[in-house]
């Protein structure tokens, strides 16, 4: 059993999707292959995001539970281990680079005795990522980038300059307007300060959970003051979803940073990748 949708693409790439027997809130899963197994009854629903159904999990008796935890203590995991089911903590979310996170497929390679296959898959992803990064260096326009949106209490949340997302934008060779800020998480800024700095930004990438311009205006009518809004240069990854609403970007993206980087290059400098079709992002309408 795994506890994050980000683990599912790695299982599938290794040909081990049949090892998944249960998941917490299966609606989040977007993969067609695994959704077919859910519909066929091979993957049991084990509760929602707030509470894992430990009773159902214990009935399944999986060989192991692959989990993640934000600290060194997890009451549910301790209970599972006391019942004789090993809990293996996956630390991929701690990685600070796109390729570092993707490399965790090697972790699953060890578990399934498929180290050589996992190495081969990662090496291909790494080669493709670095090739895209080299292509991005041919960019001569260096467009300016805004990201994030107002999430709550009129505070705009956007990636800090040392964050995972900022690294993608750096490798795409664009001018992320907060690239020089400190921190590896998110910056919490006022709307006014963001408007002052990014009103004329060329592109607005990943505007939070919003999937349409109408939703943005409903949240805050002042979004219309951004040039990227006026020029239809907003791109979101929230519209490509599985049949139950799971966002493809959140599930597949950590395993395929090469595709995320190519998306960003295609958006900001489409002439550099003339034959590439966007995988995760879509132009917001």
Which functions belong to the PLM regions below?
Residues 1-285:
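N-terminal ligand-binding lobe of clamshell/alpha-beta domains
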């Amino acid at each position: 059993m795994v506890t994050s949708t980000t683990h599912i693409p790695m299982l599938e790439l290794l040909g081990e999707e049949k090892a998944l027997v249960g998941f917490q809130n299966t609606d989040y899963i977007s993969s067609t292959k695994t959704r077919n197994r859910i519909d066929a009854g091979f993957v049991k629903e084990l509760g929602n995001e707030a509470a894992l159904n430990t009773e159902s999990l214990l009935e399944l008796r999986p060989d192991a539970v692959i989990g993640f935890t934000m600290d060194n203590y997890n009451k549910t995991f301790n209970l599972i281990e006391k019942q004789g089911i090993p809990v293996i903590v996956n630390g991929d979310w701690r990685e600070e680079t796109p390729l570092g996170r993707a490399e965790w497929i090697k972790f699953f390679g060890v578990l399934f005795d498929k180290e050589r296959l996992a190495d081969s898959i990662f090496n291909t992803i790494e080669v493709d990522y670095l090739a895209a990064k080299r292509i991005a260096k041919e960019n001569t326009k260096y467009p300016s980038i805004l990201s994030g949106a107002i999430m709550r209490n009129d505070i705009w949340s956007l990636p800090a300059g040392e964050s995972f997302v900022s690294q993608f934008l750096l490798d795409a060779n664009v001018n992320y307007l907060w690239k020089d800020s400190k921190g590896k998480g998110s910056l919490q800024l006022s709307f006014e300060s963001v408007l002052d700095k990014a009103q004329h930004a060329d592109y607005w990438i990943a505007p939070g959970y919003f999937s349409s311009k109408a939703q943005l205006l409903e949240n805050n009518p002042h979004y219309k003051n951004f040039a990227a809004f006026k020029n239809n240069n907003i791109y979101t990854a929230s519209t490509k979803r599985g049949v139950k609403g799971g966002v493809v970007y959140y599930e597949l993206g950590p395993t395929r940073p090469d595709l995320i980087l190519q998306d960003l290059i295609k958006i900001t400098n489409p002439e550099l990748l003339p034959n590439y079709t966007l995988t995760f992002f879509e132009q917001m309408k």
